[in-house]
């Protein structure tokens, strides 16, 4: 919103039940960006599944689910634009809290979980972003991953990060209150997982595909053969 020229923004969702697209459009209109919506179809999701698992090198369910949308939106950016460097919001959850850390019993537990998630960045969210972006010949810039910023946030008393305000990630939201960067309803909107926000039907199609590919007996047998 403060830049001399409008930035280009992108959002992705299922063609039938995308949740986040309308909110992304609202933000784009508010900040005056050149906005592009990318719709993914059930066929595109299923056709990309093997590629996504291969490029991730993991069978972690949550990472794969979240990577489907990121892979396809990066693919669209590469094929449809000349943009090669992206700004992305990774690491804010690790620093300021996930939805489940709203229920941390105390500040020590919150801090320990945050430290653990940062140590394991390369295994989950950053793995997803790194592979999905780079495989499409793009580069990422991660403002929340700035080392000085990470050290600063991790030095803040974890008591202040606990959800005592009725909203998760309160400190991050509060930091954006001044400056008129975001619409008020977006700033205080409930957090949603990326893999849900693209549309619940995506997971339904993946489940249907898996259940139609393997019987319960075959699955149990393969679990014994491939322990990891």
At which residue positions do the language-model features occur?
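ATP-dependent adenylate-handling active sites, centered on carboxylate activation for C-N bond formation
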Residues: 1-180, 196-209
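A short alpha-helix-loop-beta-strand transition element characteristic
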Residues: 183-190
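Peripheral terminal appendages
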Residues: 192, 197-228
């Amino acid at each position: 919103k403060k830049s001399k020229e409008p930035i280009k923004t992108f959002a992705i969702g299922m063609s039938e039940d995308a949740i986040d697209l309308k909110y992304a459009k609202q933000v784009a209109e508010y900040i005056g960006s050149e906005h592009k919506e990318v719709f993914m179809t059930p066929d595109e999701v299923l056709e990309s599944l093997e590629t996504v698992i291969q490029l991730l090198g993991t069978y972690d369910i949550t990472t794969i689910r979240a990577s489907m949308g990121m892979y396809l939106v990066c693919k669209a950016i590469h094929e449809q634009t000349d943009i090669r460097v992206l700004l992305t919001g990774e690491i804010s959850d690790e620093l300021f809290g996930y939805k489940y850390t709203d229920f941390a019993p105390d500040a020590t537990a919150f801090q320990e979980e945050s430290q653990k998630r940062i140590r394991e960045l390369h295994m989950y969210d950053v793995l997803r972003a790194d592979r999905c972006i780079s495989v499409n010949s793009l580069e990422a810039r991660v403002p929340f991953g700035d080392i000085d910023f990470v050290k600063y946030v991790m030095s803040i008393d974890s008591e202040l990060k606990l959800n005592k305000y009725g909203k998760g990630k309160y400190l991050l939201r509060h930091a954006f209150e001044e400056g008129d960067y975001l619409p008020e309803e977006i700033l205080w909107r409930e957090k949603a997982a990326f893999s849900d926000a693209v549309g619940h039907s995506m997971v339904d199609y993946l489940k249907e595909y898996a259940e139609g590919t393997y019987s319960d007996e075959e699955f149990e047998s393969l679990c014994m053969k491939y322990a990891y």
